[in-house]
Swiss-Prot record:
Its cofactor is Zn(2+). One of its GO terms (molecular function) is metal ion binding. This is Aminoacylase-1. It comes from Mus musculus (Mouse). Binds 2 Zn(2+) ions per subunit. InterPro entries: Aminoacylase-1_M20A (IPR052083), ArgE/DapE_CS (IPR001261), Bact_exopeptidase_dim_dom (IPR036264), N-acyl_aa_amidohydrolase (IPR010159), Peptidase_M20 (IPR002933), Peptidase_M20_dimer (IPR011650). Belongs to the peptidase M20A family. GO terms for cellular component: cytoplasm. Signal peptide: none annotated. Catalyzes the hydrolysis of N-acetylated amino acids to acetate and free amino acids.
Length: 408
């Protein structure tokens, strides 16, 4: 229930707001403050705390609750500590004050993405430990930097290190999205981010002339081809009510560059695109399509990748899979309606799945508008607290999954 008296605020909400006040905003996150906070949580909960610096200044913090059978693969609970920038002038309240209004809404950057989930992990573990529970499987909580700018100095490097292998993760949970309906969205895969820069070269000259074979003309052809593809995918999504956004490939033109003066036709121009490639797309064939679009535009048109992820994996969502059966069974026992989807953007789950670990993205926020990265990002305290209850049930089920075929 919503608490209007600050002195009677639920301790989990107080802890959540404390974490939100640590300004881990890109591009200069206070990672040190977050690590200190997590070290104190580990001390209070009686958990081991390991810090792994993957590159100078970028530390993965791992809190561990050992299971009764440490030979079994573990449960990995991942969350990122950084948050995206804000435009304070568009916020009703300071985005790093964690202001709670009279209705119980907590306004803060990271309230949905994804500090709520971090605290829900911690508070679920606290509750289970305080009740005297022990489970066969070890639970590791990883708190990683850099996710909001691609995870290249965070999870992407961490999964390649021996410290990650030592966790022996058998199944992972990570972030999802809010759902404005009564249902809860769970993500079993995600689209692959391709950031593509197309460069067109052509004949320069004085802008008063009809110059042939200009960079702009050829770049226009590529842009038209890509935007025509975009429209085709948009119509495919709109025509099928059963399709969700993550099931189609999206693309947006995000940057145009070129030119030195109004009266000079430039020799070089470029356009940058953000593709989010659906996981069922043939990646090699799609790259060849990009090549064809450039070739069809004329000589001197090339493309390069600023980011390219080509290892999409799908976590099984049928009851024959023991992990899905445990996850969905626990949700059913709590009377939760699940809507499995493909995540439309990118999270650190892609790196976890790419090394062969099944992962689901799940942020238990129903009846909540999707406000991640938006002005006035907020979460109601009742929704947050119910999320603690939900994760308590999920951890009990997942950490109790019996030995599977092939596990030692």
């Amino acid at each position: 229930m919503t608490t209007k008296d600050p002195e009677s605020e639920h301790p989990s909400v107080t802890l959540f707001r404390q974490y939100l006040r640590i300004c881990t905003v890109q591009p200069n996150p206070d990672y040190g403050g977050a690590i200190t906070f997590l070290e104190e949580r580990a001390r209070q909960l009686g958990l081991s705390c390991q810090k792994i610096e993957v590159v100078p200044g970028f530390v993965i913090t791992v809190l561990t609750w050992p299971g009764t059978n440490p030979s079994l693969p573990s449960i990995l609970l991942n969350s990122h500590t950084d948050v995206v920038p804000v435009f304070k002038e568009h916020w009703h309240h300071d985005p790093f004050e964690a202001f709670k209004d009279s209705e119980g809404y907590i306004y803060a950057r990271g309230s949905q993405d994804m500090k709520s989930v971090s605290i829900q992990y911690l508070e679920a573990v606290r509750r289970l430990k305080s009740e005297g529970h022990r489970f066969p499987r070890t639970i590791h909580m990883t708190f990683v930097p850099d996710e909001e700018v691609g995870g290249h100095k965070g999870m992407e490097l961490f999964v390649k290190r021996p410290e990650f292998q030592a966790l022996r993760a058998g199944f992972a949970l990570d972030e999802g999205l809010a759902n404005p309906t009564d249902a809860f969205t769970v993500f079993y895969s995600e689209r692959s981010p391709w950031w593509v820069r197309v460069t067109s070269t052509g004949k320069p000259g004085h802008a008063s002339r009809f110059i042939e074979d200009t960079a702009a003309e050829k770049l226009h052809k590529v842009i038209s081809s890509i935007l025509a593809f975009r429209e085709k995918e948009r119509q495919r999504l709109q025509a099928n009510p059963h399709l969700k956004e993550g099931a189609v490939t999206s693309v947006n033109l995000t940057k145009l560059e070129g030119g030195v003066a109004y009266n000079v036709v430039p020799a070089t121009m470029s356009a940058s695109f953000d593709f989010r490639v659906a996981p069922d797309v043939d990646m090699k064939a799609f790259e060849k399509q990009l090549q064809r679009w450039c070739q069809e535009a004329g000589e001197g048109v090339t493309f390069e990748f600023a980011q390219k992820f080509t290892e999409p994996r799908m976590t099984p969502t049928d009851d024959s899979d023991p992990w899905w059966a445990a996850f969905s069974g626990a949700c059913k026992a709590m009377n939760l309606t699940l809507e499995p989807e493909i995540f439309p953007a990118a999270t650190d789950s892609r790196y976890i799945r790419a090394v062969g670990i099944p992962a689901l993205g799940f942020s238990p926020m129903n009846r909540t508008p999707v406000l991640l990265h938006d002005h006035n990002e907020r979460l109601h305290e009742d929704i947050f607290l119910r999320g603690v209850d939900i994760y308590t049930g999920l951890l009990s089920a997942l950490a109790s999954v019996p030995t599977l075929p092939g596990e030692s």
